[in-house]
Amino acid sequence: PLYSSAASDVYKRQSLNLPVFDTKINVRNGKNVIFDVIRKRYVALTPEEWVRQHFVHFLIAHKGYPTTLLANEVMVKLNGTTKRCDTVLYRRDLSARMIVEYKAPHIEITQAVFDQITRYNMVLKVDYLIVSNGMQHYCCRMDYEHQSYTFLQDIPDYHSL
């Protein structure tokens, strides 16, 4: 791994309720960066990005999600403004299947966070919504026929979606 002692020391101590993985952390232009396996480039290492990279690794390595069907920072047009979904899982036909929204570990997951991901879903109309701050993870399956949703006990494996 590409560790800069300054960058890695800060984030090695920030444990999450997610599996540990071999992060590639560096310092570029005086700023901490982490390698994003989806975007295939280094991105600014913020607390939210730390959660994203761990959660994406969890989906790929532990839940069997194909890297090629995941995208980070997906733009959606909503009421004339452009918003960004943190991570989107696509089907093989490239229609959206799942939205994942991340918050930093110190940010409480509130109704406002669910409202945010629900607004994105007004555009994408996915089957699953996930919200995580790295410590707590919530996943719900949408039921459009009955205009409801069900919270799941666990993040589903890819093959069970």
Where do the protein language model's features map onto the residues?
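A short, conserved, highly charged catalytic patch centered on acidic carboxylates
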Residues: 12-128, 135-161
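Single conserved hydrophobic/aromatic residue that forms the stacking wall/gate
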Residues: 1-11
